[in-house]
Amino acid sequence: MAVVAVLVRKPLEQVSGLLRRRFHRTAPAALQVTVREAINQGMDEELERDEKVFLLGEEVAQYDGAYKVSRGLWKKYGDKRIIDTPISEMGFAGIAVGAAMAGLRPICEFMTFNFSMQAIDQVINSAAKTYYMSGGLQSVPIVFRGPNGASAGVAAQHSQCFAAWYGHCPGLKVVSPWSSEDAKGLIKSAIRDNNPVVVLENELMYGVPFELPSEAQSKDFLIPIGKAKIERQGTHVTIVAHSRPVGHCLEAATVLSKEGIECEVINLRTIRPMDIETIEGSVMKTNHLVTVEGGWPQFGVGAEICARIMEGPAFNFLDAPAVRVTGADVPMPYAKILEDNSVPQVKDIIFAIKKTLNI
């Protein structure tokens, strides 16, 4: 009653201020979305938006996909747009390329990109080169997507990173998402693109939740292909990575920050075309460069970044040679302890950063 009496005696503006102080709304919890859910959401929105879009691959329909990325899509869109295929990558990739040439927009899922080797002729010779060979008359709007790179306990034939393989080929666009925001924005941009786009996902990231910004929750949200993102600002060293190693780089940056070393972490997002301008701008600021990737060292993504920096204006700003952190130059072992030592770890990134900083 005392509170009521006070309210009665005070002017309205003071009463409303008092109420705001006494009664406040709890801020809404951030929307947590896994990478798997983000890809699913992106495909769902594009399937709904454009009836020319369809998904095909092994077990993508009734089984909801080997990694459940296509969960619920078959029930929503039916057999004509969510299509289970035989175990023949050469066959269904060829069907998808032909459909793209005929004006549809197929999403061709490889259960793992290691199996895309069975369809390399369709991806490279048929999809990537047709626009050029037709003098720009025949576009091939197709998406090749699926898990890429090292997983857990699947050994040499199921653990390769194809970023450098496909990034080498003119006519392809190649993206490699890390977060849920990356995954949704890049898959939607890939589906809308009139060129063949390779989307290199990561099996170990599918179940990892990220906070999805409000703008990324929009059905109109797109991430431009060919544009990197600075995930963390820094002044002492530039670290460039894509896919799962981005998280390792951020962990390393957190550790080194306690020692007074501030790292700028760049999430590459797109392998081809590469956003070299963002990397150059960062290197000109930090004067040091470390690249991190899960693939093999020879002719890799890091090697290309280092070459481009050496050939461009940022080279004169380097105070030390660039350093690469890569997977080991061996086929992926099966034993866990050997597997762990074959892919970059946080400690390897920290060692490389201290090496280039000479500390």
Swiss-Prot record:
Residues the entry annotates as binding thiamine diphosphate: E89
EC number from the UniProt entry: 1.2.4.1
Compartment(s) of residence: Mitochondrion matrix
Record carries keyword Kinase: no
Gene Ontology annotations of biological process type: glucose metabolic process; pyruvate decarboxylation to acetyl-CoA; tricarboxylic acid cycle
Recorded catalytic activity of this chain's protein: N(6)-[(R)-lipoyl]-L-lysyl-[protein] + pyruvate + H(+) = N(6)-[(R)-S(8)-acetyldihydrolipoyl]-L-lysyl-[protein] + CO2
Protein name: Pyruvate dehydrogenase E1 component subunit beta, mitochondrial
Cofactor: thiamine diphosphate
UniProt cross-references to CDD domains, sorted A to Z: TPP_PYR_E1-PDHc-beta_like (cd07036)
Protein encoded by which gene: PDHB
Pfam families cross-referenced by the UniProt entry: Transket_pyr (PF02779), Transketolase_C (PF02780)
Gene3D superfamilies in the record: 3.40.50.920, 3.40.50.970
Organism whose genome encodes this protein: Bos taurus (Bovine)
